[in-house]
From Swiss-Prot:
Mapped WD repeat ranges: 259-305, 360-399, 421-458
InterPro entries: BACURD1-3, BTB/POZ_dom, SKP1/BTB/POZ_sf, T1-type_BTB, WD40/YVTN_repeat-like_dom_sf, WD40_repeat_dom_sf
Record remark on domains: The BTB/POZ domain mediates the interaction with some component of ubiquitin ligase complexes.
Pathway this chain belongs to: Protein modification; protein ubiquitination
Keyword annotations from UniProtKB, A to Z: Repeat, Ubl conjugation pathway, WD repeat
Keyword presence, Repeat: yes
Superkingdom assignment: Eukaryota
Entries under SUPFAM superfamilies matching the protein: POZ domain, WD40 repeat-like
Stated role: May act as a substrate-specific adapter of an E3 ubiquitin-protein ligase complex (CUL3-RBX1-BTB) which mediates the ubiquitination and subsequent proteasomal degradation of target proteins.
Organism: Arabidopsis thaliana
Protein name: BTB/POZ domain-containing protein At5g41330
Disulphide-bonded residues: none
GO biological process, one term: protein homooligomerization
Domain (BTB) ranges: 11-72
Amino acid sequence: MNFPTIPHESNVVSINVGGRIFQTTKQTLSLAGTDSLLSQLATETTRFVDRDPDLFSVLLYILRTGNLPARSRAFDVRDLIDESRYYGIESFLIDSLSNSSQFEPFDLRRSRILQLNGRDSPSSISPTVIGGGLHVAHGSKITSFDWSLRQKSTVLTNFSAVDSLLEISPGVLAAGATDFPGLQIIDLDNGGFVRTTLNWENVTRSSSTVQAIGSSHEFLFTSFESSRRNSNSIMVYDLSSLLPVSEIDHCEIYGADIDSAIPSTKLKWIQSCNLLMVSGSHTSPSGVNGHIRFWDVRSRNMVWEIKEAQDCFSDVTVSDNLSAVFKVGVTSGEVFYADLRSLGTKDPWVCLGEEKKRNLNERRGVGSKIESYGNHVFCSSKGSGIELWSEVITGLVGNASRDVLEERVFRKNSLGKLADSGENKITGLAFGGNRMFVTRKDQQSVQVWQSPSRGISI
């Protein structure tokens, strides 16, 4: 018996863009979404688009892989933006720029300077949740740059100066100051409208100022200090409803107890351990003292505490990927690490620098900043340059498998100019997507660092 032949509809689609033929599949075009031009081309019989074929090839590659091709650096970002909007796939271009896999720390170069309006230098910076954009607090103003860093908008706040800033959802910021009560939730899409103000009611019922802000996927953390500076605490809020969940690290000052007088000025969530790292320090004529505490937010129990006295931290951060805490000593200016598995020991710190040359009579690390991103740690110690610290895997035991605790090996590389270059001291480091943002003392701008081998021309 002979069966009739059913014509097979080919899954391959040919598109003529500016005289050049491109072949792809209907599944690839459907990824663009039903409202996009590419999705419509998958169902049409005549597929001709009078646009630039070179730009189309870049966008088609992004649609297929989710990443920017190496050849994209030959194009101006404005052309790619316009073309992606024409095809209705701008969100794919944004996602490719915010992909942290495109971040190449060993090839970072200064690619752009973001100028700010007014005379105030940046006091706090916060990368956008998605897209590689940036929010900058300078004086009483907050300036926001979109993902392309070419469009900016500025809103005026109620603060005389914004000291803490964090984007908690697209277009919504949490902002606070050390001299103005309350944590304000600011809606940028409504011209800087303050949705609500979160406060901590202390024992003396005085107003409370914000010392630091942090967040996880579920919670918003805020470090408060009473205006009389005799009590401090960390409030935990639900990130979606902004309702209070719990209170941790509550301290009341009694007599000359210096430790309880130190509010936490940095909050870092450790996703792998479900712990919140809080840190704060105090400078007195006798030296610098501080604390680093690790809190289980759900049980409201403090898991570990490191008390800092000799060579206390100037700044501290934690790396989930490296399972370690890093600090830069305020006295020595050297970088130290503490393995998260050894935090129960008396002295968990291991010096990564030249420990033999440490001079505890100097304060070489004052004002130094340290942050982690991916598998790397960035430090602004000893001048205006940036140190990049990366772990060297020496074998399967300990470092690679993380099963056996042993001393780990880190290697230092230098980015930018050295201390004698004449550049101003670094005051802030932040990371988003494939970009590093740097602020410097007395400069009304933000430096953007990016890899020229991966990034498009901005």
